[in-house]
Amino acid sequence: MFNLIVSKLFGSRNERFIKKLKPQIDQIAALEPEMEKLTDEQFPQKIAEYKEQVAAGTSLDDILVEVFALVREAGKRSLEMRHYDVQMVGGMVLHSGRIAEMKTGEGKTLVATLPAVLNALSGKGVHLITVNDYLAKRDAEWMGKLYNFLGLTVGVVVHGLSDEERQEAYGCDITYGTNNEFGFDYLRDNMKFYKEQLVQRELNYCIVDEVDSILIDEARTPLIISGASEDATSMYGRVNSMIPLLKRDEDFEVDEKGRSITMTDDGVMKCEQILGIDNLYDSQHISFQHHIMQGIKAHHLFSRDVDYIVKDGQVVIVDEFTGRLMPGRRFSDGLHQALEAKEGVKVESENQTLASITFQNYFRMYNKLAGMTGTADTESVEFAQIYDLEVIVIPTNTAMIRKDFPDSIYKTQQEKYNAIADDIAAKYKKGQPVLVGTVSIEKSELVSSLLKKRKIPHNVLNAKHHQQEAEIVAEAGHKGHVTIATNMAGRGTDIKLGEGVLEIGGLHIIGTERHESRRIDNQLRGRSGRQGDPGSTRFYLALDDDLMRLFGSDRIAGIMDKLGMEEGEPIENGMVTKAIENSQKKVEGHNFEIRKQLLDYDNVMNQQREVIYTLRRDVMYSEDMNEMTAEFVEELFDDAFYAVEEAKGKPLDAETEEMVRVRLDELFGINRNEEFKEALPTREQAEEWVSEILDTLKESAGDHYHEIQRYFLLEALDRNWKEHLLNMDHLREGIGLRGYGQKDPKHEYKREGFELFREMLGRIKENTVRALCHLRIETEVREDEFQHKESKSDLEYSDSENTETKKKPKRRSEPKVGRNDPCPCGSGKKYKKCCGK
């Protein structure tokens, strides 16, 4: 109530924020005559002057007014486009590190040039993220005219570029590209062996176009780089043949909302009978259990032409948010192989994760993050909580006059689609263009077949035909055109009205069902009524639509029966529309919780990832590895001689002495010293001997010694990190069961994950030192001897470690904290720079 009174007296926070910018807008306008007097040659000179000022300490805010005025004039000359005042507001919002909500057709692409130029003056680079390669290339080429006019360089990062081309693109003042390319480049950079191979610079300032699509819709999908594992693929075919024998609700239960499967006791017994095993949950049969669950998911939760298509003998994922094909992307955890077995195509080998990150954690690494979209306000709470981003709604340049008709709700799919076809036919007859939005390829082809029967010409825009996408969208606003499109979210291309269309009502939008997100419905509506044009929208629903079926269509069916409604007669009632919106809010809330859960778990991995990637960078940029190697050796001696130190001068029993000797030989190869075979060396003797080994290696390797140390450390780090990711995946899969033991699964995951991480750091040190102490250089070291091999699986490694089972020597119950390890106090700093000072 208080907020309502304050809003009425002083305007909303949004209105107050925009009002505060008015003086700067006026100052920019006042500079326009001065900027008009500049010659073309003076624009790059002005930019060079501003760069010098920023380098000398001037803040970007201090020169914002002048730079925005300069960019406005540059736009007029290079693009014949002048930034409106509301676009200036959008530019200021983006520069301030917020999200600008701007309606379709308000010129978001042009708005981004203002903060991009201003922030490029720091020399640290600006990244502009788009949803696909086509838009990245289009925007870089289109807006590149403006940047080049100002003397700034512009690059574009798209699929298929070499590392050299990527380095060049990232080295530009302003770089366009997709979220996937930027994220994967970050992961790939953290798998490189030499700093010269890195392609990305510091993550400085980022503007995300269609920010809701990238930071919310795609946030549930982590980016994963994987390599082939050694699991056999034959089991997928075997399990696939038994899935039809299992009955839904009898042998397993399906939760469509949560997209999960639960086996019943009867189902478990049936699987055991079919497979001829005693206990499906026995540790030796655990892989059967995993394959069966994925097989049931493939058959009962994933549909062909909705979640994926089969093309050229391959299962290709369809992006559920944009309807685009995602070639090269695979479902993880064996699900993709289960789908391949279901569809009868070749089953590719399962992959093991080598590196992964979520978009949430990738984009939060930027020093400053901003975004723009036509629809963000409905998700403003999530943007604030997860990304600390405020949403500012930018007023339109001209008033909106589009008509949004109430939803038409029918009892059955057949009635609904007949009504849709009637509506299209009526609009086509008078020449009004129509855009039909569907939620899947299957539905778009159903509408297409109805129109073919009525002999209504039309275009289909979906994941199967997106090569012609730009042409189809460009013509969708022309007189008499009918266009059917899967999810228009993120299409990024405006639909401009053709000649004579304004007079007959503008573009008419038809939604064939409500999406689970209100935002995506709003994006479809927003394709009509751009820049004050007329237009209209209507959604057609049926009680057996997925959203209606999952969230309370029974109540509406009861109302229709009581009203005695005849077949083909729709409900058009505000209360029903409100109930549907409430259902959507429930789904949005449910999805928000899933994303928060993902982030909570990924934050544990993120802290570990930061430590590992920081260590990798330190090693790559280090000019002298001797200090780090010496530190590792000292820590391993502490571990090996722990039992000796605990004995406090007393002689060790024969068994303990033998275990200490075995440990020293595993790590340092001391059995090569004849003297040590007769009596266990003291720590001082062993340290002196290891020091001699490393000195000899240093002398033999000459200038390459630094490279050898770095190679062995990075190789050990990558190998152990890969295994650690697999262990963390297994921990995550089983952690949910801790809830049954009255333990908080997230707390247990964090605690056990940290233990696994500490053990992994110990193994990295062991592997590195062992490799150095067992290395023999018999010939002259060649330049490429220790070059990183592209395929890590090709690396062969051998040492003198005895493979027999041995009793382990007495070791510390708590691992010693290494000087480069994360400090146990939780500060996030290295131990040597925190409590270890």
UniProtKB/Swiss-Prot annotation:
Cofactor(s) recorded in Swiss-Prot or TrEMBL: Zn(2+)
Quote the EC number.
Answer: 7.4.2.8
Note one Pfam family from the annotation: P-loop_SecA
Q: Which UniProt keywords apply?
A: ATP-binding, Cell inner membrane, Cell membrane, Cytoplasm, Membrane, Metal-binding, Nucleotide-binding, Protein transport, Translocase, Translocation, Transport, Zinc
Ranges where the record places region Disordered:
788-837
Q: Which GO terms describe its biological process?
A: intracellular protein transmembrane transport; protein import; protein targeting; protein transport by the Sec complex
The record lists ATP as bound by: 87, 105-109, 494
Q: Per its UniProt record, what InterPro entries does this chain match? A: Helicase_ATP-bd, Helicase_C-like, P-loop_NTPase, SEC_C_motif, SecA, SecA_CS, SecA_DEAD, SecA_motor_DEAD
Primary localisation category: membrane
**Membrane topology reported for the UniProt record:** Peripheral membrane protein
A GO CC term assigned to this protein in UniProt: plasma membrane
Where does the source fall among the domains of life?
Bacteria
Q: Catalysed reaction(s)? A: ATP + H2O + cellular proteinSide 1 = ADP + phosphate + cellular proteinSide 2
Residues given in the record as Zn(2+) binding sites? 823, 825, 834-835
Q: Where in the cell is it found?
A: Cell inner membrane; Cytoplasm
Entry GO MF terms: ATP binding; metal ion binding; protein-exporting ATPase activity
Quaternary assembly: Monomer and homodimer. Part of the essential Sec protein translocation apparatus which comprises SecA, SecYEG and auxiliary proteins SecDF-YajC and YidC.
- Known function: Part of the Sec protein translocase complex. Interacts with the SecYEG preprotein conducting channel. Has a central role in coupling the hydrolysis of ATP to the transfer of proteins into and across the cell membrane, serving as an ATP-driven molecular motor driving the stepwise translocation of polypeptide chains across the membrane.
Which named protein is this?
A: Protein translocase subunit SecA
Annotated source species:
Maridesulfovibrio salexigens (strain ATCC 14822 / DSM 2638 / NCIMB 8403 / VKM B-1763)
